[in-house]
Amino acid sequence: MKSDIEIAQSVALQPITDIVKKVGIDGDDIELYGKYKAKLSFEKMKAVEANEPGKLLLVTAINPTPAGEGKSTMSIGLADALNQMGKKTMLALREPSLGPVMGIKGGAAGGGYAQVLPMEDINLHFTGDMHAITTANNALSALIDNHLQQGNDLGIDPRRIIWKRVLDLNDRALRQVIVGLGSPVNGVPREDGFDITVASEIMAILCLATDLKDLKKRLADIVVAYTYDRKPVYVRDLKVEGALTLILKDAIKPNLVQTIYGTPALIHGGPFANIAHGCNSVLATSTALRLADYTVTEAGFGADLGAEKFLNIKVPNLPKAPDAIVIVATLRALKMHGGVAKSDLAAENCEAVRLGFANLKRHVENMRQFKVPVVVAINEFVADTEAEIATLKALCEEIKVPVELASVWANGAEGGLALAKTVVRVIDQEAADYKRLYSDEDTLEEKVINIVTQIYGGKAVQFGPKAKTQLKQFAEFGWDKLPVCMAKTQYSFSDNPSLLGAPTDFDITIREFVPKTGAGFIVGLTGDVMTMPGLPKVPAAMAMDVAENGTALGLF
């Protein structure tokens, strides 16, 4: 079997100007980045606002193994299959972060015969969105330090600056640093640190903004620090929201590319789902809905993280809620949740599938709480056996959830046809009646307890001393009506990554809250979730190279 990059490089790409015509986009509506990439103009996005939105399909997954369960691959294959059925379909996906590409994950543009192209460009610098977000974030850091140096009129306490610098790489050495050393002309010495770019609040803001005006307002609402008397300092106090918006004026435009089968794809934004809200941009999803009859989108990691945040945080900013939710499951992950060691996952084990099914069952029940129809997609792997597949299908039938085997990695659109037909049938037969899990009027404490008990299956929430103080402070600042974005391990329903399956009778501890007032949510920190990842012992970068003719090598 060819590698992902070999498959991608064997495809004869169509000019993006031809691809976008399939959904009514003309050459004048796009800004080209070479022959195969483009950005969509503000004028076109404005022109389609009055269009009736099409059907929205959200792809999510069970709690993943470290390798992931193939949500992006399944999303791409499902969109290709829908187009093959004659349904005008678009993709709306996140763009990869360079850090994980160079680290543990390799490429992140789908896999096998379900990929978005040109995958090398998408995985590396793409159209420069990540660089623009990094620059805007670090410009703000520089402006904060300059304010301290130039007299500090706002009375910012250097010990209480919460805005960090960012880099789109995995670099553990930069998690905690000291800046301003050397001499008085080098600034005010203080503790600082770096996050990965996709953890920046500016990434979340870009993905939730509805236009340039909204982007500017959200940037102005960012809290960067506290004064000596513990009052919040906003970007608007520094009067630099205009400059930050200027840096991001092109990055806010969604990117257009294509799949192997020529399906138009909007790929834009990429916040992580374990430390942010894990969804692509509102602009990309909204525009796809108004251009196509079916839009396929995804939310990061398992349904307890990405899908919960999609439904509670992103949907209120969209023209509509999902018409169906597809939960991707793999037999290897179910066996891992059933107690099988990673080294033994290739061996047939139907009993482990039965035990691990508890994880999938809880995700199905959770998504049904939102009153949206659910379909299970089994992402087929070579090691899967007929007995294991039959076991999983029978278990799905017991809880009356439609289930289909999909082999889009190996067979592309054809491998997703059964799933696509089932999804269309479910949408036609069962109307969604979206219901949000909590109200904005609930307190932050109530929202957290709701998520932990209703989605995670936990018994109770313990708030650490700092979190308890912040609950009171944030209410005084007027932030208590914002949604909650939980920062939690992706591997478990709990805050313990080794607690697999569907655990019950556990507590989750919130050690502190982080205000993301520009994005419009409050992050609740649990466990030891890192906002700047490190590299593994053998980084994926070690297998990468470039040929003399410029062709990328070893990129997954």
UniProtKB/Swiss-Prot annotation:
Q: Which HAMAP family match?
A: FTHFS (MF_01543)
Task: Please verify whether the record's keywords include Ligase.
Answer: yes
EC primary class: ligase
Q: Which organism is it from?
A: Streptococcus pyogenes serotype M2 (strain MGAS10270)
Enumerate the UniProt keywords alphabetically. ATP-binding, Ligase, Nucleotide-binding, One-carbon metabolism
Q: What is its EC number?
A: 6.3.4.3
Binding annotation for ATP? T65, P66, A67, G68, E69, G70, K71, S72
Q: Which gene encodes it?
A: fhs1
What the record says about family reads: Belongs to the formate--tetrahydrofolate ligase family.
What are the cysteine partners in each disulfide bond? none
**What taxonomic ancestry is recorded?**
Bacteria, Bacillati, Bacillota, Bacilli, Lactobacillales
Could you tell me which pathway this protein works in? One-carbon metabolism; tetrahydrofolate interconversion
**GO terms under biological process:** tetrahydrofolate interconversion
Protein name in UniProt? Formate--tetrahydrofolate ligase 1
Q: Cross-referenced InterPro entries, in alphabetical order?
A: Formate_THF_ligase (IPR000559), Formate_THF_ligase_CS (IPR020628), P-loop_NTPase (IPR027417)
Q: Which GO terms describe its molecular function?
A: ATP binding; formate-tetrahydrofolate ligase activity
This enzyme catalyses:
(6S)-5,6,7,8-tetrahydrofolate + formate + ATP = (6R)-10-formyltetrahydrofolate + ADP + phosphate
**Which superkingdom, per the lineage?**
Bacteria
